[in-house]
Amino acid sequence: MATSKPQRSPAEIEDIILRKIFYVTLTESTDSDPRIVYLEMTAAEILSEGKELLLSRDLMERVLIDRLSGDFSDAEPPFPYLIGCHRRAYDESKKIQSMKDKNLRSEMEIVTKQAKKLAVSYCRIHLGNPDMFGNSDKPSGGLDNRLKKRNVSPVLPLIFAEVGSGSLDMFGASSSGVQAPPGFLDEFFKDSDFDSLDSILKELYEDLRSTVINVSVLGDFQPPLRALKYLVSLPVGAKSLVSHEWWVPRGAYMNGRAMELTSILGPFFHISALPDNTLFKSQPDVGQQCFSEASERRPADLLSSFSTIKNFMNILYSGLHDVLMILLKSTDTRERVLQFLAEVINANASRAHIQVDPVSCASSGMFVNLSAVMLRLCEPFLDPHLTKRDKIDPKYAFCGHRLKLSDLTALHASSEEVTEWIGKDAMANANDAGRENGNESRLLQSKEATSSSSNASGQNAKSATKYTFICECFFMTARVLNLGLLKALSDFKHLAQDISRGEDNLATLKAMRDQAPSPQLELDISRMEKELELSSQEKLCHEAQILRDGDFIQRALSFYRLMVVWLVGLVGGFKMPLPSTCPMEFSCMPEHFVEDAMELLIFASRIPKALDGVPLDDFMNFIIMFMASPEYVRNPYLRAKMVEVLNCWMPRSSSSSSATSTLFEGHQLSLEYLVRNLLKLYVDIEFTGSHTQFYDKFNIRHNIAELLEYLWQVPSHRNAWRRIAKDEEKGVYLNFLNFLVNDSIYLLDESLNKILEIKQIEADMSNTAEWEQRPTQERQERTRLFHSQENIVRIDMKLANEDVTMLAFTSEEITAPFLLPEMVERVANMLNYFLLQLVGPQRKSLSLKDPEKYEFRPKQLLKQIVRIYVNLARGDTVNIFPGAISSDGRSYNEQLFNAGADVLRRIGEEGRIIQEFMELGTKAKAAASEALDAEAALGEIPDEFLDPIQYTLMRDPVILPSSRITVDRPIIQRHLLSDNHDPFNRAHLTSDMLIPDIELKAKIDEFVKSHQSKKRTSGEDSSNKERIQTTNSDMLID
């Protein structure tokens, strides 16, 4: 008969369970497991107290302390031991569930629960005081030592495992795959007070920060990011983070770069695809790994790299957004987040400079990342109808204590005006501060209008003003985008330009090598190729992180749509004309708010599909309202940038997007004001105040000319153009026409002169024997000059063609301004000069092997010139034009019209045009004869009747109010079209200030009348001009 197993008492069962959990025994054991520790001293103490050698809940903590404090060989270090205790307690609690005795099961559940709680508690004690129990594997020391240590907190691998990471080796932590026992981390972080966890959490944040330093987007940044989010989601974790001394680092030498390197979040924001300075380079190298020798890679490989980078960056953006959002939702941490953002922005204000110091400023990657995160924070108030824009208070820009906005260049106000206005406004509103703050407090009840306190210290009345979170987020995002996304786009543009120039230089070097090889040239070529390779990699990195991320661009466009709608609200909404006085709230706003919007629109317009689904109407109306309003937007280059946006949107063909066509052809503001404002800006841009204004204007006018040519084809805009020409015949339209003529003459003259230089260099180079005899340096310089001149001619000739084209199509229907007394001679001189160049004796010197290469189309140019002649002749009802043609002493010759007609017949011009052109030539010849007769009849003209500028007989003398000198009205008015100053003393002068000299006019009229009645002496030559011989052979245009 089998013997029954003896029944164990509850005390014995409890002892067995606790020995299993804590790996200890009070009696010598034969167990071979080295982890089980015999607590000999503890056992002796228990026996001396007259107790049984059984572990119990009453002895549990005592036994645990003795185990942790003792020096036992082969025993586990404290932290892994305690984790093991918790895990074994959990396992035992599962086994207990099979006990049939409910009372015993309940008692044992209490035991295992107490054991788990004790294990968690002593984990905290150990981590907070690593030296308490000895046998610690963590180094001690100050902050610097902790920053440099290789080993991270033993809690970190458990958190990584909890949030689902992969290998942990790269973080300096154990890769044993150890995981926290179920429920351990919840108990560890949530069932405790702040003080006991604060130091542990702070060390965890330092460890997380260290794991991502110098990690690029291709590195394993996701586990630390998920761990960061996990810790911040704990109320105690959020509080500990923002109270860390590295949350907003302080110090006498704390600049933007130092803040990026030393703050807790800085290294997370540094993770990027964008290359950084070599001192702060991240690994793996994105450019080298994804885009080396990109020209030799398959398109599919590049697209794959673009997609990978975009996806990883969006994981980073989302994670960082979640972290900030968690912190912002809590009133306990929101203020510190806003403080951090403001400090980062202010410390990096110099990132807006053209040249950025990489040692004192944070990386471009950090600010592009911050741009993406801020845009995500803005999404709740970027709804289609922008319903929350009234929460944005313009006074934040001037009175807000966080951001230094009042020092930035304003849209119109000077820095002195901004300072004065802020002072006056502060005084005027001092009594209202309390009431306004009360209203803001009520707004705090709304989730959308969550407010942040305006100053952590609350030191003065100014900082007592509270602004809604929407308001703070709006202005911070505007600043971050300026220093981040828009700066990166600017860098991308300059990088592309540098690459283009580098490729041109490389081509020049290779051409020079072909002509005269040398070791130095080989070195230069090799160096240039390496530089271009690195620049190409950097350009593709920018493209991958920014331009290929359509959501990023569209979020930014949505933000700037809010920006322009809000700005327009400051001046009364989308309506014209604008108020006569610019409101100071608008005038004092930072200029970059508008400039950034325009820059982004230009970039987005050049990215396929970037504008799909983006409402552009508000942008269009904003541009029309302000592009010709210097009283609102002082900077002419900013207004010119608005035109560049329109130029990007301009439909290029009949198949162009109907959406952009509607912008130009279906909007009331566009139909009424677009042509008018383009013409006005064309005039305004003559004087920008910059030392490069002379050359800048040509690029700006090129964009305007393209738009005007397109708008001329739209009937509604052409009608508006006619009305403007009639209403402003002696105003802005006459100024526009004057500058158009000036530009045409200058550009064509420059082009033709440089063509002669190019031909000379070509001739030199074609004489191989002589060319090879020249010094190498001379040949290199001449070759560089040759390529430079080619580019200049190509650009100048393109611009000249545009100007002549505009003169041609507008003169078909608008002729009156061309024929005004102050304008007609200028126009005639221009046409004569062009005609002389195209059919005169020097035409052969302008023949080129490949004229199309230089945009030089002499046949087309001649046809347009002749059409302008004919158009003006048709509109000349008072027969003033022939006399203006023949009075040109520089270029006119009657034989030019015959020569021009011969060429026109050869190139197939309409017979009717040729006939009218010849008739105009006949009239000009007759006018020349009449002028000679009249001049002879007048004889010697008294000096007082001569205009002091051109020394011709005055017909309408006027007195200049400042210098009191009398001049001929048409001559001074022509001068005023380009320069509104008295030519004799530079005093300000306008047409309406001229004083008619009635007495002198009467004398001149009497003088002319008396001499015309006399019989003119005969025998004089009909012309003293030197004849210009023309032939019909060897024509430039054949």
UniProtKB/Swiss-Prot annotation:
Residues 940-1014 form the U-box domain. Residues 446-459 have a biased composition (Low complexity). Pathway: Protein modification; protein ubiquitination. Residues 430-459, 1010-1038 are annotated as: Disordered. It comes from the Eukaryota. The U-box domain is required for the ubiquitin protein ligase activity. This is Probable ubiquitin conjugation factor E4. It comes from Arabidopsis thaliana.
